[in-house]
From Swiss-Prot:
Acidic residues bias spans: 428-439, 710-722
Similarity remark: Belongs to the herpesviridae large structural phosphoprotein family.
GO cellular component: a single term: viral tegument
Feature: compositional bias, Low complexity: 463-474, 672-688, 745-757, 836-855, 866-884, 912-928, 936-945
UniProt entry tagged with the keyword Phosphoprotein: yes
Post-translational modification: Phosphorylated by host CCNA2.
Protein name: Tegument protein pp150
Gene Ontology MF annotations: structural molecule activity
Subcellular location: Virion tegument; Host cytoplasm; Host nucleus
Subunit structure: Interacts with host BICD1 and RAB6A. Interacts with small capsid protein UL48A; this interaction links together the capsid and pp150. Interacts with host CCNA2.
Function of the molecule: Participates in the last steps of viral maturation and release. Associates with nuclear capsids prior to DNA encapsidation and later preserves the integrity of nucleocapsids through secondary envelopment at the assembly compartment. Interacts with host CCNA2 and thereby blocks the onset of lytic gene expression to promote establishment of a quiescent state of infection in undifferentiated cells.
Bias kind Gly residues: ranges: 452-462
Gene: UL32
Length: 1049
């Protein structure tokens, strides 16, 4: 709050303000001790009323500044109490002559303490000092004052006069300026005096310091209140004769009583707040032509002019208006202006023109001195300065207004508000801005990734992690069970999930979860799914179930066509899946069960079967675990009811490809035995590609589209992140070949172990055995999958021995529940580490162990689209003699990637997790499952689909237990080129539309030509001996299937 002065020049106002600002640094803080400051209130050149107002404003500001710097004597008072106690302690031990009188003064010192009222401080200090001085004089036997009504003066005892003078000067300085007490450099501990006298002298100095500060402060406070009240009374009397509204308004403000500091501050606030209302009642100059703001002055000024001028020009003024006596002791002749001339007026009270006023004043006064000229020049200079400052202020306000307007304007259209720079890769036009439409500039909740792929292909195959967030926020959803308002869509809660522990592996961390955006809700409904935000550009296909949050096997077939409730099977991971090369993922232990199924509907599921494990023990499934099954999806979430999602894979097959994998090359090929491997490894598989891409596209074009599943990234795991005791790597081979190499040289054994690395092609086999300890998997990055035009294949892993013919086996993605028979508890799979150093092979230590341990992989969403990653099961290729193994020779042809365990719906809308159940092979009991197979029950009930899988190289690995069932074929004529003229066995999975729990049957057939094979069809298979070419063999197979179908109907 700044002070307001009227009619003062700039330098005068600055002088007044600086005095108040540096008041505590002045030698004397009394305002009346600075007469020059009081004269700057306009005493010499302003109207008396204006001078009084400026003085009132100065005293109010001065009093406020004094109270703001009110000295705090708390520490000094505490010191005084301590010194009083010291004097009393020494006084009780001193041998006074008059013990009774001394005892009374000691009691005064003992009772010395200060209350909360500071007004009593000086009185308490004075009483204590008088008693202390009397005790000191009694100790030195000095004469005391004995007169009635007189008290002992407070003085120092036994000190030199020079020392006393220095002490008095210091105390006087404290009295003049109580805000700054200078320390006294004087030693009061004199050796000639006793301890009691020295303690009394110190107490006297401290007490007098307190008394000077308190009493000088009280004196200044009383003076300020008196001067403020005096100025207020004078101004009220000055304004009493005024008849204007502003004068009466100011007079009413001044009538507020000022009794203390709070009331003084209230008066100051009122005067400053309404300054613009009454300012015109105070003239700013003593002459009209020097800048008087008010043209109406009261008659008392006219009376004063009459008394001074004595001219005939004012003879017409009525006599009753002329005051005959001075008011309140004021002498109009000896006015406070001290010779300054008041305003000049006409007889009728109106202002005269400038020339007439100048002539009248010259005639009345008789002089026009140089001082008036100097003041006029100064006034003009001041006016110019004021005008220049006003112009600068106006220009500054305009600039500030322009800046505010520019800040309020919307941002330029070149950069969208919600646009963010891509973190992984750039767009096709080589700029950092997002290429989405205008409606995709608001962050909205992630929906379940499922609908058409219009925006999915806009990224050019790059899966931006934030592209899923950019969806339409300006339109309302048109589909789904609920339609929530637009405001709720825009303000939906989200949280960026940091690397966290997954359900599948509580002790390990997901590598890609740091960029995963999850809603803060428990489930993902269709709240935000609609036609306007139906694109899926986050790398996942448009499936109604997000594989990142789906951990159950759910039957999503149409419930109206099912005779019984669908079976929901939940699995839990027991072993990690390792990533090798270009995305070939196999379990970390060959011959071990990966998933444990738990049928939800016991009526439609087979009898409970023991869960095969490494050691042959049974691991029951806890129903309260987080892997418990969930209810079937509603109809609006069924992929069968969303035709746009089903066609997503055909339009956007490149989105299934992971562009962020970093291929590494390794030139070393080793096969060593290591007891503590750095990473669990699995044998590389021999792969075969048997058809052209054009034909394969026609074969696999109409397959259903599903979502991609999370896989486990063991490549980026740390050395200590995996259990080294669970899987022991006996050898790992990394090929050092080019991309199109056909044959890979056999591995050479060196005493050095190599770690898995990403390679684009894997075409070799290495021996491996596993221990009986299971591992927990780790969900990792999405695995890169090839283009949809690749060829379906089968991967088998067997120990390498001599030279035999190629052995490739395959199974359909879904097997009837009737073919899944539990393995008896007596058949336990055991393993041991048996390595032959010379040949690089491993043999089974038990006769019941399968000769070749294979890992069964389930199809991923990319596998359904791409034949190169079709859902194939690496069944155990059991030979007739368990003691011998059938090692395959190196396979020719380009290698490809294999499917990975999945958590999403697959063929025909059936959700399959992990590997599909294996099929009993020849050489094993019908009711037995090998250690590498999985016990699970599924209920496929969907429209009939005929799927021809790649052939197997041996007839013994074919399936011949299921009765043949015919079904309409969906193969086109061009699909005949998909099969090569090789001696192999294929499996046809036939889906039946009948309402039964076993709607899928398997038909095995032999594709071998009689001219090349030299033998007839294998037992238990559909012989196609009459076919001369592979195309004829396919046609014969389809005709036989049609015939069987018609017969069944």
């Amino acid at each position: 709050m700044s002070l307001q002065f009227i009619g003062l020049q700039r330098r005068d106002v600055v002088a007044l303000v600086n005095f108040l600002r540096h008041l505590t640094q002045k030698p004397d803080v009394d305002l009346e001790a600075h007469p020059k400051i009081l004269k700057k209130c306009g005493e010499k050149r302003l109207h008396r009323r204006t001078v009084l107002f400026n003085e009132l404003m100065l005293w109010l500001g001065y009093y406020r500044e004094l109270r703001f710097h009110n000295p705090d004597l708390s520490s000094v008072l505490e010191e005084f109490e301590v010194r009083c106690a010291a004097v009393a302690r020494r006084g009780y031990t001193y041998p006074f002559g008059d013990r009774g009188k001394a005892r009374d003064h000691l009691a005064v010192l003992d009772r010395t303490e200060f209350d909360t009222d500071v007004r009593h401080d000086a009185e308490i200090v004075e009483r204590a000092l008088v008693s202390a001085v009397i005790l000191a004089k009694m100790s030195v036997r000095e004469t005391l004052v004995t007169a009635i009504g007189q008290t002992e003066p407070i003085a120092f005892v036994h000190l030199k006069d020079t020392e006393v003078q220095r002490i008095e000067e210091n105390l006087e300085g404290v009295r003049r300026n109580m805000f700054c007490a200078k320390p006294l450099d004087l030693n009061l501990d004199r050796h000639a005096n006793t301890a009691l006298v020295n303690a009394v002298n110190k107490l006297v100095y401290t007490g007098r310091l307190i008394m000077n500060v308190r009493r000088s402060w009280e004196e200044l406070e009383r003076k300020c209140l008196a001067r403020i009240q005096e100025r207020c009374k004078l101004l009220v009397k000055e304004l009493r004769m005024c008849l204007s509204f502003d004068s009466n308004y100011c007079r009413n403000i001044l009538k507020h009583a000022v009794e203390n500091g709070d009331s003084a501050d209230t008066l100051l606030e009122l005067l400053i707040e309404d300054f613009d209302i009454y300012v015109d009642s105070f003239p700013q100059s003593a002459h009209t032509f020097l800048g008087a703001r008010s043209p109406s002055l009261e008659f008392d000024d006219d009376a004063n002019l009459l008394s001074l001028g004595g001219g005939s020009a004012f003879s017409s003024v009525p006599k009753k208006h002329v005051p005959t006596q001075p008011l309140d002791g004021w002498s109009w002749i000896a006015s406070p202006w001290k010779g300054h001339k008041p305003f000049r007026f006409e007889a009728h009270g109106s202002l005269a023109p400038a020339a007439e006023a100048h002539a009248a004043r010259s005639a009345a006064v008789g002089y026009y001195d140089e001082e008036e000229k100097r003041r006029e020049r100064q006034k003009r200079v001041d006016d110019e300065v004021v005008q220049r400052e006003k112009q600068q202020l106006k220009a500054w306000e305009e600039r500030q207004q322009n800046l505010q307007q520019r800040q309020q304007q919307p941002p330029p259209p070149t950069r969208k508000p919600g646009a963010s720079r891509r973190l992984f890769g750039s767009s096709a036009d080589e700029d950092d801005d997002d290429d989405d439409d205008d409606e995709k500039n608001i962050f909205t909740p992630i929906k379940k990734p499922g609908t058409s792929g219009k925006g999915a292909a806009s990224g050019g195959g790059v899966s931006s992690i934030f592209s899923g967030l950019l969806s339409s926020g300006s339109q309302k959803p048109t589909s789904g069970p609920l339609n929530i308002p637009q405001q709720q869509q825009r303000h939906a809660a989200f949280s960026l999930v940091s690397p966290q522990v997954t359900k599948a592996s509580p002790g390990r961390v997901r590598r890609d979860s740091a960029w995963d955006v999850r809603p803060l809700t428990e489930t993902r409904g269709d709240l935000f799914s609609g036609d306007e935000d139906s694109d899926s550009s986050d790398g996942y296909p448009p499936n109604r179930q997000d594989p990142r949050f789906t951990d159950t096997l759910v039957d999503i077939t149409d419930t109206e066509t099912s005779a019984k409730p669908p079976v929901t099977t939940a699995y839990k991971f027991e072993q990690p899946t390792l990533t090798f090369g270009a995305g070939v993922n196999v379990p970390a232990g060959a011959g071990a069960a990966i998933l444990t199924p738990t049928p939800v509907n016991p009526s439609t599921a087979p009898a409970p079967a023991p869960t095969p494990t490494f050691a042959g023990t049974q691991t029951p499934v806890n129903g309260n675990s987080p892997w418990a099954p969930t209810a079937p999806l509603p109809g609006d979430m069924n992929p069968a009811n969303w035709p746009r999602e089903r066609a997503w894979a055909l339009k956007n097959p490149h989105l299934a490809y992971n562009p962020f994998r970093m291929p590494t090359t390794s030139t070393a090929s080793q096969n060593t035995v290591s007891t503590t491997p750095r990473r669990p490894s699995t044998p590389r598989a021999a792969v075969t590609q048997t058809a052209s891409r054009d034909a394969a596209d026609e074969v696999w074009a109409l397959r259903d589209q599903t979502a991609e599943s999370p896989v486990e990234d063991s490549e980026e795991e740390d050395d200590d992140s995996s259990d080294t005791g669970s899987v022991v790597s006996l050898g790992h081979t990394t090929p050092s070949s080019d991309y199109n190499n056909d044959v890979i040289s056999p591995p050479s054994q060196t005493p050095e172990q190599s770690t898995p690395s990403r390679i684009r092609k894997a075409k070799l086999s290495s021996p491996m055995t596993t221990t009986s300890t299971s591992q927990k998997p780790v969900l990792g990055k999405r695995v890169a999958t090839p283009h949809a035009s690749a060829r379906a294949q089968t991967v088998t892993s067997t120990p390498v021995q001599g030279r035999l013919e190629k052995q490739v086996s395959g199974t359909p993605s879904t097997v009837p529940a009737t073919l899944l028979q539990p393995q008896p508890a007596s058949s336990k799979t055991t393993s041991s580490r048996n390595v032959t150093s010379g040949a690089g092979t491993s043999s089974a230590s038990s006769a019941r162990q399968p000769s070749a341990s294979a890992s069964v992989l389930s199809p991923t969403e990319d596998d359904v689209v791409s034949p190169a990653t079709s859902p194939l099961s690496m069944l155990s290729s059991a030979s007739p003699s368990p003691a011998k193994s059938a090692p395959p020779s190196p396979v020719k042809g380009r290698g490809s990637r294999v499917g990975v365990p999945s958590l999403k719906p697959t063929l025909g809308g059936k959700a399959v997790v992990g590997r599909p159940p294996s099929v009993p092979v020849s050489g094993s009991a019908p009711g037995r499952l090998s250690g590498s197979s999985r016990a699970a029950s599924t209920t496929p009930t969907y429209p009939a689909v005929t799927t021809v899988y790649p052939p197997s190289s041996t007839a013994k690995s074919s399936v011949s237990n299921a009765p043949p069932v015919a079904s309409p074929s969906i193969l086109k004529p061009g699909a005949s080129a998909a099969l090569q003229s090789r001696r192999s066995t294929g499996i046809a999975a036939v889906g039946s539309p009948v309402k039964s729990t076993t709607g899928m049957k398997t038909v095995a057939f032999d594709l071998s030509s009689p001219q090349k094979s030299g033998t007839g069809p294998q037992p238990g298979s559909a012989g196609m001996g009459g076919a001369k070419t592979p195309s004829d063999a396919v046609q014969n197979i389809l005709q036989k299937i049609e015939k069987i179908k018609n017969t069944e109907e």
